[in-house]
Regions:
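N-terminal beta-strand motif that seeds the catalytic metal site of vicinal oxygen chelate
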Residues: 1-14, 44, 60-61, 122-143
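Core segments of cupin and vicinal oxygen chelate
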Residues: 2-46
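Vicinal oxygen chelate
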Residues: 13-14, 62-110, 118-121
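Short acidic/glycine-enriched loop/turn segments that link adjacent beta-strands
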Residues: 32-35, 55-57, 94-99
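Short, charged/polar surface micro-motifs in flexible loops or helix N-caps
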Residues: 41-46, 54-56, 66-71
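Residue-level structural signal for beta-strand termini and adjacent loop
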Residues: 51, 114-116
Length: 143
């Protein structure tokens, strides 16, 4: 089953953790000094914040999937829309590791489709602060 993903770039992670924990009624599932993630069930959202973005606000949107088949399906949908994508196997980002595909919609909004395989000890790096495929390495992911 797919889970919608929202990643916000924030200037003050601690203040935002307090705010979103109050709004969501639960603490983050993962919390680090520069990153926090809530795996919400109602609505089914992977909501993440980090201080790693270029500017405060929506860093990117995406879909977290539960299987290789779902990742392949969404990657095919992006290709059918004639949007370039950057595929990554065993990417390390947002204290997680997994397979993912990055794309940029016609408006310039970055989209991440990913399958998480497990935790990672460091924030890591991923591409796509610029349009695909000329992206520079930088992380802003869902983990």
């Amino acid at each position: 089953m797919k889970r919608f993903h929202v990643h916000l770039a924030v200037d003050d992670p601690a203040a935002n953790v307090r705010f979103y924990s109050t709004v969501f009624g639960v603490p983050p599932t993962v919390q680090k000094p520069d990153y926090a993630k809530w795996m919400l069930e109602d609505p089914r959202v992977n909501f993440a914040i980090s201080s790693r973005g270029l500017t405060a606000g929506v860093d990117h949107l995406g879909f977290q999937v539960d299987s290789d088949a779902e990742l392949t399906e969404l990657r095919a949908a992006v290709a059918a829309a004639e949007i370039d994508a950057l595929d990554q196997a065993e990417a390390a980002c947002c204290y997680a590791r997994g397979d993912k595909a990055w794309s940029v919609d016609p408006q310039g909004l970055r989209w991440e489709t990913f399958l998480t395989h497990g935790a990672h000890t460091v924030y890591g790096e991923d591409p796509v602060q610029e349009p695909v495929p000329t992206a520079q390495t930088r992380c802003g992911c869902g983990g």
